[in-house]
Every structure is written in structure tokens, then in C-alpha cells.
């Protein structure tokens, strides 16, 4: 019985045996020549670049560690190359070659043959006979109607109200379920020269339709990066009722020339410089950046600017002849993905 008790662990209890600690798997370090060396090595002994893809490592922590060390190695090599190049340039002195110009989207573009020459007779004739000729000949003064999509939310409504303080003689009206085809004849009957429609998606403004009345054209823009006045840091006080100055940058192609004239026709001819307010439409990389500033004269030689808001970014989607007609309208230009495969834009 005693022996049986001893075998059963005494008192009928089963003896508990500790399992031997599992042997740690041997790590494989990849040498710089691509060969694998077996054996337990520290993480610091692994050579870079590894002879395998880091994404093939299944263990998440190990994969993150290897990727972090690989990035550190890349930064060290880049810094060492910069220091070496700097020493070589200092040693050569005046004989050092000029620094290479960094590649950007703008300087890598192919020259666009449609760039407008302001002294061209054909361009002058087009300007004298297009839809904006009555404005530039001072026969009409701008009167703008600003509206929204159906059931707008607060952010879109506030953007319309702030736009009305930027553009003189502009009026904000709510859609109330009316279609644009019914709104446009009413605008023409009340002598409005332009119609601006702010569209939204998920309570955020995401589109702008600008239609010149009564004969068009109509431009559709994608809107992004909207910032209202309260969201702008170090903004100035609310704008005054003075007519702002307008600045149009880089609207040099035929398409850009037409869009620039559309924006110019929104503002009266004679800006009131005493108000020191300026509205800027800056075209760069096929995006149109809108900013509204006030000049701050610090002295006779120093001038600063103070942003008033709002600010947003536009990207042209289509340009349509005539007023808004989504079904039978004739389009002069439509954004296509294949058009941006080349750098000739």
C-alpha cells in the first residue's frame, strides 16, 4: 500500500511535474552576402539590407522591429551620403558643380501650346465677343445669387453667408426643393448675372457650380479643404463692406483664361483700396486656391497680410456651354483621368 501511495503521489494525489522549459528557436541571421547563418544571435547582429522581404515575416513584433531597424539604417546611409557630398563640395570650392534642381510637378511639365498670348489678335477678338464682354465693357454690374443643395446643413449655410460678405452685391437664398432649371429663369428675370450653388456630402461642402447668366458658360468644381473663419488661426476681424481687390494667378491657358474671366466677373470693376482687402484665386498644379486677406501696413516699407477667411480649394471638373443643363448640355471641357497621364497639362 505504501508503494501504491508513493506512486500515486501520497494520499491519492497525482504528482504534478513541471514541464521542461521549451528551447528557444534558433534565429537565423542573414549575412551581407546573402548567406544564412544559424545560431542564437542578438537582434543587433543582423545585417542590412536583409536577404528576404520584411513583409514575409509572420510575427508582427519581429516584423515591426526589422522594419524600424531598416528605416534607421536607411536614414544613416542617407545622412552619411549628404555629409560626404558636403565635404567634397567644400574641397572643390568654386570648382564644385552646381546643385541639381529638385524635380517638381510644375518644372517637369511639357510646355502647353494653348498658352494664351495677351497681345494675340485672335485672343483680343474672343474677349470682345464672348459671354463676359458686357461685364468687361462696363455695360453690366455683377449681381450674384448664392444658394445650396437641398436641405443644407449648418456648415454649408455658414460658408454661403461668409461668401456673401466676400463678394459684393451677393444674395443668399435657400433652394426650398426647386430645380436649378426653374431657378435660372427667375434669376435672369431679376437681373442676376451669376449663380453660385454650393453642394455638400455628409454635412461637408464638396462641390461648387458657377453659372454665368444669361448665356453661360457653367463650370463645375470639386471643393475641398474648406475652412470657415472660426477655424482659421490668427484671423483678422470680420471683413468690411469695401469692394475687395481681386488677384488671378497662373490662368494662362485657354481654359484657364476662360475660368479666370468667370471669377473676375463676380467682383465690381473699381476696388476700394481704402478697405485693404484682397481676394486671391491662385492656380497651381490644376488646383485653384482661394484666400481672402487684408493688408497690414506696418511702415512705409513693410507690409503684412492677415487672413480673414473663408478659404477653400477648387478643382475644375467640367465646363459647359450655356446655362446649367445636365441632360442636353454641350460641354467644352470635361475632366478625364487619361488626360492627366501626360505632363502636358
From Swiss-Prot:
It is found in: Nucleus, Nucleolus. GO terms for biological process: maturation of 5.8S rRNA; maturation of LSU-rRNA. Keywords: Nucleus, Ribosome biogenesis, RNA-binding, rRNA processing, rRNA-binding. Transmembrane segments: none annotated. It comes from the Eukaryota. This is Ribosome production factor 1. Residues 87-97 have a biased composition (Basic and acidic residues). May be required for ribosome biogenesis. It holds the Pfam family Brix. The gene is Rpf1. The keyword Nucleus applies. GO terms for cellular component: nucleolus; preribosome, large subunit precursor. Residues 303-320 are annotated as: RNA-binding. SMART domains: Brix (SM00879). The keyword rRNA-binding applies. Gene3D superfamilies: Probable brix-domain ribosomal biogenesis protein. Residues 1-57, 70-105 are annotated as: Disordered. GO terms for molecular function: RNA binding; rRNA primary transcript binding. Residues 142-325 form the Brix domain.
Amino acid at each position: 500500500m505504501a508503494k501504491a501511495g508513493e506512486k500515486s503521489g501520497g494520499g491519492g494525489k497525482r504528482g504534478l511535474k513541471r514541464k521542461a522549459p521549451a528551447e528557444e528557436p534558433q534565429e537565423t541571421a542573414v549575412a551581407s552576402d546573402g548567406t544564412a547563418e544559424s545560431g542564437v544571435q542578438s537582434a543587433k547582429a543582423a545585417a542590412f539590407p536583409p536577404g528576404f522581404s520584411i513583409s514575409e515575416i509572420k510575427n508582427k513584433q519581429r516584423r515591426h522591429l526589422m522594419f524600424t531597424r531598416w528605416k534607421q539604417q536607411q536614414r544613416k546611409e542617407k545622412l552619411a551620403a549628404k555629409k560626404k557630398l558636403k565635404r567634397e563640395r567644400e574641397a572643390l570650392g568654386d570648382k564644385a558643380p552646381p546643385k541639381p534642381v529638385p524635380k517638381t510637378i510644375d518644372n517637369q511639365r511639357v510646355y502647353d501650346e494653348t498658352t494664351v498670348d495677351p497681345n494675340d489678335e485672335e485672343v483680343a477678338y474672343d474677349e470682345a465677343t464672348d459671354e463676359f464682354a458686357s461685364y468687361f465693357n462696363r455695360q453690366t454690374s455683377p449681381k450674384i445669387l448664392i444658394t445650396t443643395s437641398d436641405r443644407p446643413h449648418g456648415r454649408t449655410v455658414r460658408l454661403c453667408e461668409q461668401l456673401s460678405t466676400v463678394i459684393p452685391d451677393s444674395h443668399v437664398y435657400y433652394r426650398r426643393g426647386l430645380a436649378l432649371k426653374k431657378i435660372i429663369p427667375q434669376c435672369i428675370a431679376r437681373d442676376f448675372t451669376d449663380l453660385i450653388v454650393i453642394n455638400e456630402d455628409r454635412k461637408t461642402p464638396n462641390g461648387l457650380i458657377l453659372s454665368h447668366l444669361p448665356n453661360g458658360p457653367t463650370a463645375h468644381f470639386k471643393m475641398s479643404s474648406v475652412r470657415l473663419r472660426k477655424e482659421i488661426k490668427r484671423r483678422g476681424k470680420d471683413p468690411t463692406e469695401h469692394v475687395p481687390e481681386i488677384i488671378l494667378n497662373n490662368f494662362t491657358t485657354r481654359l484657364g483664361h476662360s475660368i479666370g474671366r468667370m471669377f473676375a466677373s463676380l467682383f465690381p470693376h473699381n476696388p476700394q483700396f481704402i478697405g485693404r482687402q484682397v481676394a486671391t484665386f491662385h492656380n497651381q498644379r490644376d488646383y485653384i486656391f482661394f484666400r481672402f486677406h487684408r493688408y497690414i501696413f506696418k511702415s512705409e516699407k513693410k507690409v503684412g497680410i492677415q487672413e480673414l477667411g473663408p478659404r477653400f480649394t477648387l478643382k475644375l471638373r467640367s465646363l459647359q456651354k450655356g446655362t446649367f443643363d445636365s441632360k442636353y448640355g454641350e460641354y467644352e471641357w470635361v475632366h478625364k483621368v487619361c488626360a492627366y497621364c501626360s505632363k502636358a497639362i
